[in-house]
A protein has these predicted regions:
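Juxta-kinase regulatory segment immediately upstream of eukaryotic protein kinase catalytic domains
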Residues: 1-35
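Generic, low-specificity signal for short hydrophobic/alpha-helical stretches with a mild N-terminal bias
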Residues: 2-6, 27-30, 40, 60, ...
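Short hydrophobic/aromatic-rich motifs at helix boundaries and adjacent loops
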Residues: 14-18, 47-51, 114-116
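Generic hydrophobic secondary-structure packing signal
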Residues: 16-19, 41, 70, 139
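ATP-binding glycine-rich phosphate-binding loop
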Residues: 27-50
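ATP-binding pocket architecture of kinase catalytic cores
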Residues: 51-153
C-alpha cells in the first residue's frame, strides 16, 4: 500500500476527507454530521454540517507544519482576541475528551493529524469588480488592533 505522502494529490483528497469525517467522532455531534472540503493550502479546511442545522469549520493540520504546542499557542491568542473584544474569531470546540486539539489517525498516514473544530462564522466573498476600499479600511483597523494586542499579550 502506497504511503499517503507518496500519493498524487488527487488520491490524497479522498483520504483527507475520510480522516475529516473520522475526526467528527471526537466531538459531541449528532449522527449524520458530514464534512465537505472548502480549501486545501497549508491545512485542509472542511465545512461541517450537522443534521440539526448547526455548522462548523474543521481544520486538519498538515503533517509536520506546526507542532501541537504552536497550534495551542495560536488558539490561545485567538481565544483572547475574542474574549477581549479585539476581533471576532471562530470559537474552537472542545472534543469529548475536553481538549481543543484532537489527534486523529488514518491507516495510510504515518502519524496522526492535529485537528481543530470551530464554530462557523458567516460571511461572503466579495464579488468580482466590487469596490473593496471600505472593507480594506476595516481590515486595516482590525489589523492595527491585533498588532496592539499582540505587543501587550
Amino acid at each position: 500500500m502506497t504511503d499517503f505522502d507518496s500519493l498524487p494529490h488527487e488520491e490524497q483528497l479522498p483520504l483527507l476527507l475520510e480522516l475529516a469525517n473520522a475526526a467528527l467522532g471526537a466531538y459531541d455531534l449528532p449522527a449524520g454530521t458530514v464534512a465537505k472540503m472548502l480549501n486545501l493550502s497549508e491545512n485542509a479546511t472542511y465545512r461541517v454540517d450537522a443534521p440539526d442545522g448547526r455548522r462548523f469549520a474543521l481544520r486538519v493540520h498538515r503533517d509536520g507544519y506546526h507542532s501541537r504546542q504552536a497550534i495551542a499557542s495560536e488558539l490561545a491568542w485567538e481565544i483572547d482576541l475574542r474574549r477581549t473584544g479585539v476581533v471576532t474569531t471562530p470559537n474552537p470546540i472542545k472534543g469529548r475528551d475536553g481538549e481543543i486539539i484532537q489527534d486523529i489517525a488514518h491507516p495510510r498516514m504515518k502519524r496522526p493529524r492535529h485537528v481543530v473544530l470551530f464554530d462557523w462564522e458567516t460571511g461572503a466573498e466579495p464579488g468580482i469588480g466590487e469596490d473593496l476600499s471600505g472593507p480594506f479600511e476595516v481590515l486595516g483597523e482590525i489589523t492595527a488592533r491585533m498588532h496592539i494586542h499582540a505587543r501587550q499579550w
